[in-house]
Amino acid sequence: MSLLNLNYFEIFGIEAEIIIDIEHLNSKYLTLQSEFHPDKFVNASNLEKSMATRVSTYINDAYNTLSDLVERVDYILQINN
């Protein structure tokens, strides 16, 4: 399954809750970026480079949203709408 099909909480393997384990979020973020960062795909096809960029951007957006309490609460409201 593509990460792009997961909600932000699912990407990091955490429950959609207001209080989250920030250390786990940080650790998982670094792991995901080490796997999907576009720099890892320098010798890949243009399609693979494009997909890596999309996935990396999605991971960044997810991380930035979940690391901020106000944005996290807003996101929880969005996905439970």
Model-assigned labels for residue ranges:
Residues D21-H37, S50-Y75:
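J-domain helical core
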Residues M1-K40:
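N-terminal J-domain/J-like co-chaperone modules of DnaJ/Hsp40 proteins
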Residues I76-N81:
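Short, charge-rich amphipathic alpha-helices with coiled-coil/heptad character
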Residues V42-S50:
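Short, surface-exposed loop/turn segments at secondary-structure junctions
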